[in-house]
Amino acid sequence: MLQSLRKMTGPLNPCNSGSIIHKSAQNGLASITFGGFGWRTADITINAVTLANARLLKATAGNLYNGAASVSNFWYCYFNSTTTIRVRAYVGNNLAVNFGWGVEEFSQSQSIQRGQSLCFAGGSTGARTQDVTITALPDYTKAGVVIFNEFSASGEASGGTSDCRNITGQLTSNTNLRIAGDVIVADATGFYISWEVYPLNG
């Protein structure tokens, strides 16, 4: 079972997850401070690293526009040939309901191939959860590790309408996980994005 959507108070399993918490740096993870209102984009770049015969991924956070980002390294993780990533985005004051994103969750899991787009629809409130299973394709693997590029989530709708968050992915030699949305944040509002990347085959 993946970790619940909450502010982390204890150590994280470095192979399972990472998070960005607005105006807060916890467990050595990156801290992002937003300025004003409007679109927020956080890019988490994961590069393949080979160290002592171990296949590792090194993650850094940065490239935030319409705001400022504190960039740091946060974890290494083994990748096997089949990997699932779950992305959760939440906006709220102390993880309470605020600005239309609440406590509901919507999820789905399926395989994705190069260039394939996924979409799921939910209500106008709720945390958005998207599971995507990345299956190894020989043409797009490197040293037996499945890595993907330009995996993005965007398209939050508000005002009582449905949400359609598009997930796209490509299998290439490097990974960029981009989470974007038309999230409106006030000074007293927390902004929480977590991602979980872990091997399915040990």
Residue ranges and their predicted role:
Residues N16-S72, Q110-R165:
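Beta-rich globular "head" domains
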Residues A48-N53, F79-T83, P138-D139, L171-T175, ...:
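Residue-level recognition of beta-strand termini and adjacent short loop/turns
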Residues A89-N93, D182-V185:
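Short beta-strand-plus-loop segments that form exposed binding edges in beta-rich domains
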Residues A96-S109, T189-G202:
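Short, structured beta-strand segments at or near domain termini in extracellular proteins/domains
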